Amino acid sequence: GLWAVINNAGIGGAAGPTPWLITEDFRAAMNVNFFPLVEISTRFLPLLESANGRIINMASVLGRFSFQGLAPYVSSKYAVEGMSDAYRRCLKPHGVSVHLIEPGFFKTNITNIVENKRRFMQVWTRLNSRLKNQYPLTIVQKYTAGLSAKMDKLCSSDVSKVVSAYERAVTDLRPRARYVVGYDAKYIFLVLQALPEWISDYLMTRVDMKP
């Protein structure tokens, strides 16, 4: 048998306002962040059943509260959340438990400032002339500079908290369904999620890039 399967692969994917994005941007994120998770979990399910094992899936707090500009990534993490909830309820009678790791912002390759600027610019360069006129390069550069400064303050460098959550999900006698990791996840994003949509929408659109 097999005690635990940990699904941890992930990419940030294409970044930019929704009008910039195309179907392939969403497909690319799903092809790494979601579909392999389903395939691996299904493939190892017989071994997990024989050991009353666990599936631990890397999601994100952005799988519970959306962040504009990252729609492909956010969509893939919402898919991970939904799949994990469905699997958890379905597999419980089979002796298999399913658990989610939901980090906030940590300093990783996905949140790397240089990489995020590159992803924004990569999408901007393919836009047609109408969208480039709506979103001039000067506005994009100003927005990405401001976003980088905010991300630098928001991101925690203590990734050991995420590792600790994995360890607990694997070894806890009574593991949680969700392990929310990081102060921003617990005290910013989940608070925003609990607010009425008109309030959270107002707060989030104040930091959005406007044409």
Range-by-range predicted roles:
Residues 5-6, 55:
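Conserved hydrophobic beta-strands of the Rossmann-like cofactor-binding core
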Residues 12-27, 69-72:
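Conserved mid-core segment of classical short-chain dehydrogenase/reductases
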Residues 41, 76-79:
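Active-site helix of classical SDR
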Residues 41-42, 85:
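A short, exposed helix-loop element centered on a Lys and neighboring polar residues
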Residues 60:
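Residue(s) in the substrate-gating loop at a strand-loop-helix junction
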Residues 65, 86-97:
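Active-site-adjacent segment of SDR/Rossmann-fold oxidoreductases
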Residues 93-176:
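SDR active-site lid
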